[in-house]
Amino acid sequence: MIEMAAEKEPFLVPAPPPPLKDESGGGGGPTVPPHQEAASGELRGGTERGPGRCAPSAGSPAAAVGRESPGAAATSSSGPQAQQHRGGGPQAQSHGEARLSDPPGRAAPPDVGEERRGGGGTELGPPAPPRPRNGYQPHRPPGGGGGKRRNSCNVGGGGGGFKHPAFKRRRRVNSDCDSVLPSNFLLGGNIFDPLNLNSLLDEEVSRTLNAETPKSSPLPAKGRDPVEILIPKDITDPLSLNTCTDEGHVVLASPLKTGRKRHRHRGQHHQQQQAAGGSESHPVPPTAPLTPLLHGEGASQQPRHRGQNRDAPQPYELNTAINCRDEVVSPLPSALQGPSGSLSAPPAASVISAPPSSSSRHRKRRRTSSKSEAGARGGGQGSKEKGRGSWGGRHHHHHPLPAAGFKKQQRKFQYGNYCKYYGYRNPSCEDGRLRVLKPEWFRGRDVLDLGCNVGHLTLSIACKWGPSRMVGLDIDSRLIHSARQNIRHYLSEELRLPPQTLEGDPGAEGEEGTTTVRKRSCFPASLTASRGPIAAPQVPLDGADTSVFPNNVVFVTGNYVLDRDDLVEAQTPEYDVVLCLSLTKWVHLNWGDEGLKRMFRRIYRHLRPGGILVLEPQPWSSYGKRKTLTETIYKNYYRIQLKPEQFSSYLTSPDVGFSSYELVATPHNTSKGFQRPVYLFHKARSPSH
């Protein structure tokens, strides 16, 4: 607009107001373009020189020179006009821009900031340098021009304005450089991957990094651990829920520990002793085993010596590991000190052939056991009936107690009340004694089972052979509680079977028929094994048939051995059949000969005329292993005179009164220690007393 007006005719523009003195250095005034500055200069020039002189137009060369180069205008112009072009007058430019217009090295004019007024206009000199405000002098870059603007905040205190926190001011003022990011990474990574995890994707890089030390996790080798795939035998039943329907073949979800790892060195040591003692000469029949001469437990230990039936649980393994080892090695020190050279040489050879660790361990055991049993083996000669052979007899007057003492954990089972007795006697099959017992002995009879334990055999007889009443007696209340709970398991078995199979023919043929039907059962046996029986507890009902299972079975806690003989005389007949299976040893050890005789006499008086006693005695060779359970058992063991092989003669003597007896059979068992003969004693129909 101004240029267009200048081309046509000159016109007057009022001069801008002079800048304030306190804002002269701030550069905050209005900015006037160069053509306006030239125009105002011309107006002032015309006013000073007179109205007759014409001002150059905006399009003239002089005006163009004045717009393009203030320095050139200063040379061509004179006086105040040149100062006007250099100083910038009404532009109120900043001090930085004013310095750009001056040549380098030129000093400021002496009339800086001085106002000169003409006749019709106002002339302004170069702007004054900025005045310090609030005690802070802004920093000027040395090279001139605009640099990075610093934060103009108050640090000196006093004065107004916004103030930042002190710690931020100090950090900003004192920091000369920006933060430096890390560049050296020990694992070879970068700022985005400091741990160099991406290198694990490359197997070659991973192998290179881990050549010396595993600085980073290596990649897993492919195919190092092959995946095992188990293919089930029956693809339609991969979990084998319907395959094992027989209770004997049920595999529990959490199987019981067999305890074989505790005795892993015992079998090897027994074999060495047996090989060493095979050349010894003993006045024993050829059919008798050698091991009873060492520890008196040959019947139950022979399978271990020959290495047979390793998987089957062995008897009395639950709490007698220390006693078994002590008694096995106890005769060796006496043999070494004995007068016979033939007895001392073989044990020495066995010690030398054993490994160093095992031999040192057994040597310590020998020293301990020799002190405890030196008196028991030393002295005069003993009889062969004691089961000690030619290893020396025993004095009945002096038997020192074992140095190891009697442990409470062993005392817990001093009556043979093992809670898992049937577990290691019949690990995967039914009780072998059921095959030698005849159903006609029990059908419709009153039966008493002494030492029933958890009642498996008692419940089997009550369920299969239909006795009129079946009473299970045991001295341990915990076993009786378990026996009562087991009734539900047998009821669950009946629920699994079809109704027509419940009434089968007795005997072996009936058992086989029942087994065939059980295999066709579709109920998962694993559910019963893991979750318990599915049958509800039985509620006694009035008028129910007491001869039908489970109403015909009851379990009672009590001690069958009476304290005095006069109590035996008061016993009245109540039962037709009495079962005494694997009980005589525990009665013998806890109550001696007198207690066992009282039990036999009470059984005879408890039977009705024509009744029978089913007896399964333990052999004398199994007594010695249990003699250290308690102090009472230890003393009774050396006082026993009535041996198991004499039971038949005593029961048929006038002291008891049985009329006859017979050997039924010797049931087969995986452990020869449980292969015990079963005898049947008959009570006369017209008793003599």
From Swiss-Prot:
It is found in: Nucleus. Changing residue 152 to A: Promotes RNA polymerase II transcription pause-release. Gene3D superfamilies: Vaccinia Virus protein VP39. Residues 1-167, 258-314, 332-407 are annotated as: Disordered. Its EC number is 2.1.1.-. The keyword Transcription does not apply. Changing residue 421 to A: Nearly abolished methyltransferase activity. Changing residue 585 to A: Decreased methyltransferase activity. S-adenosyl-L-methionine binds at residues 422, 433, 451-453, 474-475, 559-560, 581. Residues 431-686 form the Bin3-type SAM domain. It comes from Homo sapiens. Expressed in chronic myeloid leukemia cells, adrenal gland, brain, cerebellum, kidney, lung, mammary gland and testis. Weakly or not expressed in other tissues. PROSITE patterns: BIN3_SAM. Belongs to the methyltransferase superfamily. It comes from the Eukaryota. There is a cross-link at residue 643 (Glycyl lysine isopeptide (Lys-Gly) (interchain with G-Cter in SUMO2)). The modification Phosphothreonine is found at residues 213, 291. GO terms for cellular component: 7SK snRNP; nucleus; ribonucleoprotein complex. This is 7SK snRNA methylphosphate capping enzyme. Core component of the 7SK RNP complex, at least composed of 7SK RNA, LARP7, MEPCE, HEXIM1 (or HEXIM2) and P-TEFb (composed of CDK9 and CCNT1/cyclin-T1). Interacts with METTL16. Interacts with RBM7; upon genotoxic stress this interaction is enhanced, triggering the release of inactive P-TEFb complex from the core, yielding to P-TEFb complex activation. Residues 1-10 have a biased composition (Basic and acidic residues).
